[in-house]
Curated annotation (Swiss-Prot):
Keyword Cytoplasm annotated: yes
GO molecular function per UniProt: ATP binding; RNA binding; tyrosine-tRNA ligase activity
SMART domains: S4
Family designation: Belongs to the class-I aminoacyl-tRNA synthetase family. TyrS type 1 subfamily.
Entry protein name: Tyrosine--tRNA ligase
Sequence motif 'KMSKS' region, residues: 231-235
Keywords (A to Z) from UniProt: Aminoacyl-tRNA synthetase, ATP-binding, Cytoplasm, Ligase, Nucleotide-binding, Protein biosynthesis, RNA-binding
Species, as recorded: Opitutus terrae (strain DSM 11246 / JCM 15787 / PB90-1)
Reaction equation(s) it catalyzes: tRNA(Tyr) + L-tyrosine + ATP = L-tyrosyl-tRNA(Tyr) + AMP + diphosphate + H(+)
Length: 425
């Protein structure tokens, strides 16, 4: 299977400036390609995985990938896919974000490959030395304003209430210049990106044709969306980031394990390196036994391992088991706090657990797991109450400080999934 065959099977092909010519060129040998990542935040997010993993897919097929960190373009802001002007970042913010993003890019590509090592560049290194007048003469001269206004990214903003500034209007010239520079200095013939980058990419192929008379291609992938058409990559608490400080590995894992049945096979194709045979088998299993959620677990395991590594993925799976009655032995306090972060929490004075401890029936009422002590006794007698995920057998049971997790937490559960954390203050 060629790289283009693989992309098409995975649903990663949207458009190409000249598919027949690119197919022929790829058949002649390895090409150098690039994709840009602007430092709009200090971490990449789930949506960035599509182009980033595409670079890796090309590398696995023997091609030469370049990851471009947008130290220059990040100072301007891309209008593509935006309904309003971006807030300009300060040079210090851009520098901080670039440093963080470069570190993340380095985890997904092989920079030590023997025959086709990946490379990383920062467009500020060749953009910063150019004067404004030089840029207007050497780049701006080759662009028709009429053609720029016809680009979807510009036209959509012109039709919006906020309009578009000259700063963002000029963004496509900067990206076009990047492609030209890489074509001249690194023989980069292909730029890849999401469909919202089509206008910027074709600006680059046009500039290369006019300035160099040399071939260059653009290839785009569909935006990562759910079955209902909305963008994929956000949880109820916001964007899902690759940086563990912004989205913990546990929450990252949970985001994917909760994928809808209608989305999971598509996500397996787009966000993992599982083979067609493996994904087809998971699809068959999903249709036969959707309740097992084997496809979702495979997705979460594959993507979490890819982004955070084997150890963090194993920890995330272990933590997930807590919410399904798993034991708490060996769980760290930070992991416990992450898991129970969205569980209702009730505070309790430490004195209540002193001496012989507090009656469990009273704690259940305090925690909101029972309306009365009488109902709490019935629930305990019925085998439906758990303390730290261990079933309680006697309604007369008391809870003491010795049972506190990390000296300050008590995990109470009613039934299979109704939890409350009691925090000692």
């Amino acid at each position: 299977m060629t790289i283009l065959d693989d992309l098409q099977w995975r649903g990663l092909y949207a458009d190409c400036t000249d598919l027949a010519a690119l197919t022929q060129r790829l058949g002649q040998g390895p090409v150098t390609l690039y994709c840009g990542f602007d430092p709009t935040a200090d971490s990449l997010h789930v949506g960035n995985l599509v182009p980033l993993l595409a670079l890796r897919r090309f590398q696995l097929h023997g091609h030469h990938p370049i990851a471009l960190a947008g130290g220059a373009t990040g100072m301007v802001g891309d209008p593509s896919g935006r309904s309003a002007e971006r807030n300009l970042l300060t040079p210090d913010q851009v520098a901080h974000n670039i440093a963080s993003i470069k570190q993340q890019l380095g985890r997904f590509l092989d920079f030590d490959a023997t025959t086709n090592p990946a490379r990383m560049v920062d467009n500020s290194t060749w953009t910063a030395p150019i004067s404004f007048l030089e840029f207007l003469r050497d780049v701006g001269k080759h662009f028709s304003v009429n053609a720029m206004l016809a680009k979807e990214s510009v036209r959509a903003r012109l039709e919006s209430e906020s309009g578009i500034s000259y700063t963002e209007f000029s963004y496509m010239l900067l990206q076009a210049h990047d492609f030209l520079h890489l074509r001249e200095t690194m023989n980069c013939e292909l730029q890849v990106g999401a469909t919202d980058q089509w206008g910027n990419i074709t600006a680059g192929t046009d500039l290369i044709r006019k300035k160099l008379g040399a071939p260059a291609w653009g290839l785009t992938f569909p935006l990562l969306t759910k079955s209902d058409g909305t963008k994929y990559g956000k949880s109820t608490s916001g964007a899902v980031y690759l940086d563990p400080k912004r989205t913990t590995p546990y929450r990252f894992y949970q985001f994917f394990v909760q994928a809808e049945d209608a989305d999971v096979i598509k996500l397996l194709k787009v966000l993992t390196f599982l083979s067609a045979e493996e994904i087809t088998a998971l699809d068959t299993d999903l249709k036969a036994n959707p309740g097992a959620r084997a496809a979702q677990k495979a997705l979460a395991r594959a993507v979490t391992t890819l982004v955070h590594g084997d150890t963090e993925c194993a920890n995330a799976i272990r933590a997930s088991e807590i919410m399904f009655g798993g034991g708490l032995d060996g769980i760290s306090e930070s992991l416990f706090q992450d898991v129970v972060g969205e569980i209702p929490t009730k505070e309790l004075e430490a004195a209540k657990l002193s001496g012989a401890g507090a009656p469990l029936v009273e704690l259940l009422v305090h925690a909101g797991l029972a309306p009365s002590k009488g109902q709490a006794r019935k629930d305990i007698d019925g085998g439906g109450i758990y303390v730290n995920n261990a079933r309680v057998g006697e309604a007369s049971r008391a809870v003491t400080t010795g049972e506190l997790l990390f000296g300050k937490y008590l995990l109470l559960r009613k039934g299979k999934r109704t939890y409350t954390v009691v925090k000692i203050v």
